[in-house]
Design a protein with these regions (language model features):
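Short glycine/serine/threonine-rich phosphate/pyrophosphate-binding segments
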Residues: 154-160, 180, 221-226, 249-253
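An N-terminal-biased, well-structured beta-alpha scaffold segment characteristic
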Residues: 1-82, 86
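Generic hydrophobic/aromatic pocket-lining and core-packing "Φ" positions
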Residues: 23, 80, 118, 159-160, ...
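Rossmann-fold NAD(P) dinucleotide-binding segment
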Residues: 49-75, 203-211, 221-241
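Glycine-rich phosphate/diphosphate-binding loop of Rossmann-like nucleotide-binding domains
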Residues: 1-21, 128-214
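Rossmann-fold NAD(P)-binding glycine/threonine-rich loop
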Residues: 73-100, 223-260
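Residue-level detector of alpha-helix initiation sites
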Residues: 52, 112, 153-154
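Glycine/serine-rich phosphate-binding loop and adjoining beta1-alpha1 elements at the start
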Residues: 55-146
């Protein structure tokens, strides 16, 4: 549709290789392949990418550009300041809201994050990774382990699904009773507990859990620190905490990003 309006479309060389799209596929669709990200920025008004600009990319941006990407600025004030200084107009995927209040561009990423949080959590529960050495699912003569999911939005709901499929007992904590009731209608009551979230209930749940998933999200704002440093002291040595909210600053007081 962009090409149909006599616009030019540039794609960075090899940008689609990892997802199965060759340079030739873009060429056949009418795009022109450029060698570097700088070439893309230099020749374009509208920049479409996946993640927020790296620090070295800010120098390529100016007031002539409209940047369309996942920005997650609430968790990175320095990046926000740098973007403002460029004069660029930024449109954040994660804040694009449909008429019904849903977040259609954030939802797919959240579903993936929720699923992966259980995979990563189980990996770090292994003894070689200094974990408890437990499997989440119940096996013969061994009781199921507990997983607590704090925040039952899209990512949290996917984590719940994955936890139940693994055979774990899942504690679901959310500030909305309506949300908890909705989830109970979906998941029933077997191997799952629905808990209204507050400081005491969070502390109690995470003290029993082998794995804790933090998935609290407030649109366009820094995630509230619902799991404090003091609460972490009640967790079992070797238990694991995965903070999905880290791209919005994290919902755990001590969380910090360790990868990009």
């Amino acid at each position: 549709s962009v090409l149909a309006k006599n616009n030019k479309v540039y794609v960075e060389k090899d940008a689609g290789i990892a997802i199965g799209f060759s340079n030739q596929a873009y060429i056949e669709s009418g795009a022109e392949i450029l060698g570097t990200a700088f070439d893309i920025y230099d020749g374009s008004e509208l920049i479409v990418k996946v993640k927020e600009p790296l620090p070295e990319e800010n120098k390529f941006l100016s007031s002539k550009n409209i940047l369309f990407t996942y920005l997650h600025l609430a968790g990175n004030k320095e990046n926000a300041k740098n973007l403002i200084s460029t004069g660029v107009t930024g449109i954040a995927y994660e804040t694009v809201t449909a008429d019904d209040g849903s977040l259609p561009l954030l939802s797919p990423m959240s579903k993936i994050a929720g699923q992966i949080s259980l995979v990563v959590g189980q990996y770090f529960l292994l003894k070689p990774n200094k974990g408890l050495g437990t499997l989440l699912g119940a096996i013969e003569n061994v009781s199921a382990r507990e997983v607590s999911v704090v925040g039952a939005g899209v990512a949290g709901t996917e984590a719940i699904k994955k936890g139940l499929r693994s055979g774990a007992h899942v504690n679901v904590l959310d500030i909305s009773q309506n949300k908890l009731d909705e989830l109970q209608r979906s998941f029933g009551t077997e191997n799952i507990s629905y808990i209204l979230s507050n400081a005491d209930s969070i502390s109690n749940a995470i003290s029993r859990s082998d794995l804790v998933i933090g998935s609290v999200y407030v649109v366009g704002k820094e995630a509230p620190k619902v799991i404090t440093k003091e609460m972490l002291k009640v967790m079992k040595p070797g238990s694991v905490l995965v903070d999905i909210s880290i791209d919005q600053g994290g919902c755990v007081e001590t969380s910090k990003p360790t990868t990009h």
